[in-house]
From Swiss-Prot:
GO function terms (MF aspect): GTP binding; GTPase activity; guanosine tetraphosphate binding; translation elongation factor activity
Protein name: Elongation factor Tu
This protein's encoding gene: tuf1
Primary subcellular site in the record, as a coarse category: cytoplasm
Catalytic reaction(s) noted: GTP + H2O = GDP + phosphate + H(+)
Region named G3: 81-84
């Protein structure tokens, strides 16, 4: 039985910790929940509770992720923390944990390390829009100049990957000291400064219902005397009866009008984000529409065939390939509801990609797909998933 109703009085934001192994991501996560729960309510989570992250399946891929939540003065946060580097790679690429912003944890004693760089690059590739830095373990650095040097390095690294390095908030502290209840500047107060930075620096995300209408088409029916009906789940926005809509992808884009919306055999005057609906289209022939296209607000999304993506290749244990793949590998790319064949170009100097690797690729599809940066896809061979990816940049 639920312990009382979930009160959604504050806006909801999704965040997560990223950064190099042993720089203190999990300790910081524990410190945030512990310290904020004292002031704003919520549940304190100990390091061990977070570290024993349960396994989840996202698109057939096993990922270990810990989910915690906490309140600040203005918001409710859902926060993800992963135990291992591979879990971060999988999590960010599959979008299992969509982040509105990330907290980059960097040890002041070590400065930026290989995974610091890799997680910043991943954040850029998968479209994490904002990064806030927590410079951890400041109790281990006595030299003020050394701290400034590390801060400068982190800012340069962020700028290198197109984040606004000069403007990113950097909070100096010690997660461990904060957990121990230390009241000095780098203890508990640092956690409150981090909370303030989260509230002020990450804008409240736009809700799905407020975005332009989009429905991935799952099925097409012909209803005699009424016309053609497409079905699917509204991904975002609202569609109203009488509105113009576009059918995008696979073939040339066509405009049509929504003349009816049906849900559970009832007629509605509109369908909105989250609804499973049938949409009746005026004057559209059954053979003009197919699964894999999208129905959308006119002009809101364009069809593309050529893009770069960041991909995680499933390991053998995850049911992926047993062998590497090479340049010009031609699998199927599963976007939303359908497979499209495409060819993969590997980055210069990369001979092959092994199962369990992640890699940046350039893809050319045989047919155009309604696409925008941040769209997730699966890579399949004969119906089984061998990889997961995200569109990083559209070329054409």
């Amino acid at each position: 039985m639920a312990k009382g109703k979930f009160e959604r009085t504050k806006p909801h934001v999704n965040v997560g910790t990223i950064g190099h192994v042993d720089h203190g991501k999990t300790t910081l996560t524990a410190a945030i929940t512990t310290i904020l729960s004292k002031k704003f309510g919520g549940e304190a989570k100990a390091y061990d509770q977070i570290d024993a992250a349960p396994e989840e399946k996202a698109r057939g891929i096993t990922i270990n992720t810990a989910h915690v939540e906490y309140e600040t003065a203005n918001r409710h946060y859902a926060h993800v923390d992963c135990p291992g580097h591979a879990d971060y790679v999988k999590n960010m690429i599959t979008g299992a944990a969509q982040m509105d912003g990330a907290i980059l944890v960097c040890s002041a004693a070590d400065g930026p390390m290989p995974q610091t760089r890799e997680h910043i690059l991943l954040a850029r590739q998968v479209g994490v829009p904002y990064i806030i830095v927590f410079l951890n373990k400041c109790d281990m650095v006595d030299d003020e100049e050394l701290l400034e040097l590390v801060e400068m390095e982190v800012r340069e690294l962020l700028s290198k990957y197109d984040f606004p390095g000069d403007d990113v908030p950097i909070i100096k502290g010690s997660a461990l000291k904060a957990l121990e209840g230390d009241q000095s500047d780098i203890g508990e107060p640092a956690i409150f400064r981090l909370a303030e930075a989260l509230d002020s620096y990450i804008p409240t995300p736009e809700r799905a219902i407020d975005r332009p209408f989009l429905l991935p088409i799952e099925d097409v029916f012909s209803i005699s005397g009424r016309g053609t009906v497409v079905t699917g789940r509204v991904e975002r926005g609202i569609v109203k009866v009488g509105e113009e809509v576009e059918i995008v992808g696979i073939k040339a884009t066509v405009k049509t009008t929504c003349t009816g919306v049906e849900m559970f055999r009832k007629l509605l005057d509109q369908g909105q984000a989250g609804d499973n609906v049938g949409v009746l289209l005026r004057g559209t022939k059954r053979e003009d529409v197919e699964r894999g296209q999208v129905l959308c607000k006119p002009g809101s999304i364009k069809p593309h065939t050529h893009f770069t993506g960041e991909v995680y290749v499933l390991s053998k244990e995850e049911g992926g390939r047993h062998t590497p793949f090479f340049n010009n590998y031609r699998p199927q790319f599963y976007f939303r509801t359908t497979d499209v064949t495409g060819s993969i170009e590997l980055p210069e100097g990369t001979e092959m990609v092994m199962p369990g690797d992640n890699v940046s690729i350039t893809v050319k599809l045989m047919a155009p797909i309604a696409m925008e940066e941040g769209l997730r896809f699966a890579i399949r061979e004969g119906g089984r998933t061998v990889g997961a990816g995200v569109v990083a940049k559209i070329i054409e």
